[in-house]
Amino acid sequence: MDAPINPSSPTRSSYETALERQWLIKDEPSHHVDLGCHFTLEIKAFSPKMIELLETGSLTLGSVYQGLYNLIKDKDCKGLELDRDTTHGNKLHVLAAAFLCVLRKYENQVRFYNVKTKDSLTGEIQYMSRVHIGDDNLGLFDPDTYRMIGGSFPEGIYRLNLRTQLTPRGEDDGLEIIMGTILTVPVRGPADRQPLGVLMDRQLRQFPVGTNPWSSLGEAKPKGRSLSLLRGILM
């Protein structure tokens, strides 16, 4: 599939403006199929100051999205892998849809699963946060929701993976980011194929095997204000 996802409104000239504004047409009947999502975001901090950002919740899902959005809109983004039906033309729609899936999954609670570890060889302390939707039949959301990002998704499997470093404004040190996204249109669950978590583990080897790997990785802390910040960015 070479053609990019087309914006719903002919008045918009770019995918960027589709993501920066709210385009929700309530009167027009929906004809889209449901979208399934497998999504994993891993954030690692190594310096004391960056560890504190994650521990205190100063770093929100919305701020991470804003950093990723600004990064991958560059055609030559380092560490970005596009495969299957994801193209440079539709990659920002895929990113936005994946984050909307996270919001729908957790509804009013966006959670980071946090754990602090110590390297057995170097003794280095690192702090890791993960956001995860582990099975695409849990990542459903209604078609009208993803119309807010200004596009409709043709049938296919959209994969977007990114390994990079984000540095907050005014800071010298950064955060290591690994994101893996698979969107399926229409939804494809375990009934007709293997869970998408199996495919994700093959692509991102350091994630634990299985579709719910975070149960033993530490306390889940609600990040309610992430929701409003992320919505402000998307809309």
Swiss-Prot record:
The gene is M. It holds the Pfam family VMR2. Belongs to the nucleorhabdovirus type-2 matrix protein family. Plays a major role in assembly and budding of virion. Completely covers the ribonucleoprotein coil and keep it in condensed bullet-shaped form. Inhibits viral transcription and stimulates replication. Most abundant protein in the virion. Homomultimer. Interacts with nucleoprotein and with the cytoplasmic domain of glycoprotein. It is a peripheral membrane protein. It comes from Maize mosaic virus (isolate Maize/United States/Reed/2005) (MMV). It is found in: Virion membrane; Host endomembrane system. GO terms for molecular function: structural constituent of virion. GO terms for cellular component: host cell endomembrane system; membrane; viral envelope; virion membrane. Keywords: Apoptosis, Host membrane, Membrane, Viral envelope protein, Viral matrix protein, Virion. This is Matrix protein. Disulfide bonds: none annotated.
